């Protein structure tokens, strides 16, 4: 039962971090900051986050940024890809483009032209 309580506590702490990531996706997100939110050391946070989410914090952030970019590309045709890159926390359009192509196996332009 203590193990279940600990897991629930850990899940709540990681949920606080994922909420923070989603609310601040346009900002730089450091391991130290996220570990602090979860009240873990950076090493322990990385371990717990990866076990509970199935992704490293870095991979989770990258995927969340790309998914937000895809949503904005579809919903806001008036926003440029450069503006979307900034809104999603990518430091440049080329970084968004490279990650987008790796994730979706198509370019931003190809994605935007899909019906």
Regions found by a protein language model. Name each.
Residues 37, 89-95:
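Short, basic interhelical loop/turn and adjoining N-cap
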Residues 1-23, 32-33, 38, 42-44:
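An amphipathic alpha-helical interaction segment
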Residues 100-115:
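Conserved short alpha-helical interface segments
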Residues 11, 60-63, 96, 110:
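Intrinsically disordered, low-complexity sequence elements enriched in Ser/Thr/Gly/Pro
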Residues 43, 93-94, 109:
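Key DNA-contact positions within bacterial/archaeal DNA-binding proteins
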Residues 14-32, 51-91, 114-115:
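Terminal helix-turn-helix DNA-binding modules in bacterial transcription factors
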């Amino acid at each position: 039962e203590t193990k279940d309580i600990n897991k629930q506590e850990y899940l709540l702490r990681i949920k606080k971090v994922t909420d923070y990531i989603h609310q601040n996706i346009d900002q730089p997100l450091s391991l130290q900051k996220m570990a602090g939110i979860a009240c873990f050391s950076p090493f322990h946070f990385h371990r717990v986050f990866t076990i509970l989410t199935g992704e490293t914090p870095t991979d989770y952030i990258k995927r969340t940024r790309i998914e937000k970019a895809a949503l904005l590309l579809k919903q806001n045709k008036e926003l440029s890809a450069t503006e979307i890159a900034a809104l999603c926390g990518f430091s440049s359009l080329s970084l968004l483009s490279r990650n987008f192509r790796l994730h979706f196996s198509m370019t931003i332009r190809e994605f935007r032209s899909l019906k």
